[in-house]
């Protein structure tokens, strides 16, 4: 468990959340265009609404708009790969939400939503893995590939100078949490 960050990191965390919520909103929209199970599509629609609300909340808090995209990001077309990507990014988002609530306890609803999102995708990943065979192997390969690309992504998220004294510890913590979750759900082995 990380120690709470000092108040000097508040704006940087809020700005990072603004970017992350914008990215999540676009990723969830793009995911809806893929071939996903019916129950997942319903969740993604609700998830999109929540992300849009979060985005507006952060825009108001910061007094700035997020940068709108003109095209949806490319998302994996295979559900087993898409589920791993969404689970991974939601796990990272959950850790940032925990950091945020350490600075802004009034934003606990963001943390609660992130816990629901992670729980949903964790359940979906477990469902995929219980199928065994090539489907489960494909999910594990996707997790390995996604995890290899994660350190530079987390480093970008922590680029703000206010994070400098904590950057290494934060990066180790976030990557460690992802590794623990991937191990616990069965996406990776030690």
Question: Whereabouts are the PLM-identified features?
Answer:
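Non-heme di-metal
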Residues: 1-190
């Amino acid at each position: 468990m990380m120690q709470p960050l000092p108040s000097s990191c508040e704006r940087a965390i809020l700005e990072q959340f603004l970017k992350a919520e914008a990215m999540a909103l676009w990723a969830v929209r793009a995911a809806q265009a893929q071939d996903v199970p019916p129950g997942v599509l319903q969740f993604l629609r609700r998830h999109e609404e929540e992300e849009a609300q979060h985005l507006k909340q952060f825009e108001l808090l910061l007094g700035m708009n997020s940068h709108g995209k003109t095209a949806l990001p490319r998302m994996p077309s295979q559900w087993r790969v898409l589920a791993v990507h969404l689970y991974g990014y939601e796990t990272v988002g959950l850790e940032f939400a925990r950091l945020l609530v350490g600075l802004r306890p009034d934003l606990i609803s963001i943390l609660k939503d992130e816990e629901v999102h992670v729980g949903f995708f964790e359940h979906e990943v477990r469902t995929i893995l219980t199928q065994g065979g090539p489907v489960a192997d494909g999910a594990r390969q996707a997790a390995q590939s996604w995890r290899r690309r994660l350190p530079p992504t987390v480093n970008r998220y922590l680029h703000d100078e206010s994070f400098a004294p904590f950057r290494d510890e934060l990066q180790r913590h976030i990557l460690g949490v992802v590794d623990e979750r991937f191990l616990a759900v069965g996406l990776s082995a030690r």
